[in-house]
Amino acid sequence: MNNDLLKRMRAYRGYKQYEIAEIIGLSRQTYNYKENGRLPLTSEEIVKISRELSLTLKDVNDIFFNGQLPN
């Protein structure tokens, strides 16, 4: 996962960590651990974050799969 890209995209879209945490049903601390790579995100969390941030498929691939998904 590209943690820095996720942080930049979240900030660019105007969200604070606690807001994304609330949206996906996590505590702010747990979301912080996940955003910083200390804990993995579940596929359901990836979907919720992607929808909330209006990420493109390319964004999702670059952020969550390090560009490793086939085109």
What are these regions (language model features)?
Residues 26-40:
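Recognition helix of helix-turn-helix/homeodomain-like DNA-binding domains
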Residues 1-4, 69-71:
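Short, Lys/Arg-enriched, disordered terminal segments
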Residues 4-23:
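Short basic helix-loop element that most often maps to the first helix and adjoining turn
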Residues 9-12, 51, 58-71:
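Short, charged recognition helix plus adjacent turn
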Residues 38-51:
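Short, basic-rich loop-to-helix N-cap that marks the start of a DNA-contacting helix
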